[in-house]
């Protein structure tokens, strides 16, 4: 992982993705003229801080671009749902059905990826302004990252359900801090994307650089220690190491998206558009 420069202090984003798909926030996808209903829902005044009179970037977009924004945010919310399902199963020590739940969420992520990809290709063919092109390129190039994030989260869910009955509780508990941190990174990334918040995008990079790597190394050391102390449990220890590695890579892909978003916002700042 590349070295990163110091980041600004943390400004916590509103946790408008914390609840798992409440109907008011996550309506079923429908084809509507105008902004995607998901974006309108995220602007609920009960969950967002007071804003100035300026219009949110997500709400001021052309209809086609707003639809892409809504679907991209939905991909992030699915990732958060998946991480929450893993975290709750680990906290409660109830792992039955976790893989099936993760498979459903991953399938929805894959479907959204195809929808967004098609929308981007249509936009590219139609001709775009420089700013619109920068937005669609950022989204298009980030789709592979979010798809990989979903893959890694699914792999962790599957391994957790498979090996949890044979693993010690301490092994499973080691995953929780990293999962919580990654969930926070997803929330910050979603807020940065919806609100064009540069600080929130940089928070994603800072959290990965300062905390994810340290937690990953800690988990790897713990896995190696257990492997030495209990060689008969080598398969479980190696699986714990693999889950830690997958979570660390998941964070790397979130950082890749945040870096592209930072570049997009800096470009808009220089052009006086933010």
Swiss-Prot record:
GO biological process, alphabetically ordered: intracellular phosphate ion homeostasis; negative regulation of phosphate metabolic process
SUPFAM superfamilies the record matches: PhoU-like
Organism (species): Deinococcus radiodurans (strain ATCC 13939 / DSM 20539 / JCM 16871 / CCUG 27074 / LMG 4051 / NBRC 15346 / NCIMB 9279 / VKM B-1422 / R1)
Protein name: Uncharacterized protein DR_2053
Signal peptide positions on this chain: none
Any Pfam family hit: PhoU
Family membership: Belongs to the PhoU family.
């Amino acid at each position: 992982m590349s070295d990163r420069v110091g980041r600004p202090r943390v400004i916590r984003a509103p946790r408008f993705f914390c609840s798992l798909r409440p109907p008011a926030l996550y309506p079923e996808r429908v084809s509507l003229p105008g902004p995607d209903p998901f974006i309108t829902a995220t602007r609920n005044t009960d969950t967002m801080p007071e804003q100035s009179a300026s219009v949110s970037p997500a709400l001021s977009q052309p209809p086609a671009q707003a639809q892409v924004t809504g679907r991209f945010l939905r991909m992030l919310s699915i990732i958060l749902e998946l991480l929450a399902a893993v975290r709750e199963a680990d906290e409660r020590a109830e792992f039955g059905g976790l893989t099936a739940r993760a498979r459903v969420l991953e399938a929805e992520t894959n479907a959204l990826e195809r929808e967004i990809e098609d929308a981007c290709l249509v936009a590219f063919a139609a001709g775009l302004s420089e700013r619109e092109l920068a937005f669609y390129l950022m989204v298009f190039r980030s789709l592979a990252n979010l798809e990989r994030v979903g893959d890694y989260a699914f792999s962790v869910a599957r391994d957790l359900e498979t090996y949890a009955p044979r693993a010690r509780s301490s092994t499973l508990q080691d995953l929780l801090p990293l999962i919580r941190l990654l969930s926070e990174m997803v929330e910050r990334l979603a807020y940065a994307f919806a609100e064009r918040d540069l600080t929130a995008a940089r928070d994603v990079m800072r959290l990965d650089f300062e905390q994810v790597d340290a937690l990953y190394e800690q988990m790897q050391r713990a896995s190696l220690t257990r492997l030495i102390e209990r060689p008969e449990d080598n398969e479980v220890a190696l699986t714990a190491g693999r889950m830690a590695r997958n979570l660390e890579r998941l964070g790397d892909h979130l950082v890749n998206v945040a870096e592209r978003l930072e570049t997009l916002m800096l470009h808009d700042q220089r052009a006086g558009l933010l």
